[in-house]
Amino acid sequence: MKKAFLIVTALLGLSLAAVAQPKAVGLRGGLFGNEFNGEISYEHWFSIFDNDYDFLEAELGVFGGNGFKGTLIYNVTLVHPEFTDRGDWGLYIGPGVVTGYGTGVNNKDELKSFAFFGLAAQLGMEYTFWFPLQVSVDFRPSFMIPAWMNRSELGKNANRWCHFAFGVRYAF
């Protein structure tokens, strides 16, 4: 009985803590090379190691009009400067994973479909206004492993794996 009570109490406490954490949902995108990449973005902040500004970022999106991808990144806020009296600034960095499916041209100029997975990193800056709006700019290099590419073919598709983006989110 004590174990059941402790488990229920712990689960209730975790659910209340999850509800109390700040979140943001919106769009992230940019023009990379001659291709547009756009994503639906969700951020969930939480506290680990006494840092209240860590957040998990999950995104689903399209790239180049011929593929889709999903990204999950754990961001740690490096600095949280007080530049202004209102609003919050943050400079963050984090590792993550990415997976997806698309088409691309190999070194024989053949159009191929491919699935990919890989590791990503992110360095960015965001500003959350005193009203529920957040804007961000970030740089995200990714190391992808497409199923059909060999090492010489990675260069032709490099603009898909390293890019800058701008984000606009509703913070709640």
Role assignments for model-derived ranges:
Residues 1-22:
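Cleavable N-terminal export/targeting peptides
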Residues 44-133:
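Gram-negative (and chloroplast) outer-membrane scaffold detector with strong preference
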Residues 33, 101-103, 143-147:
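Feature marks short, surface-exposed loop/turn motifs that line or immediately flank catalytic pockets
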Residues 130-172:
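Predominantly the C-terminal beta-signal and adjacent terminal strand-loop region
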Residues 19-70, 169-172:
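Short glycine/proline- and aromatic-enriched beta-strand/turn motifs that initiate or cap beta-hairpins
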Residues 8, 39, 50, 149-153:
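Primarily recognizes Gram-negative and organellar outer-membrane beta-barrels
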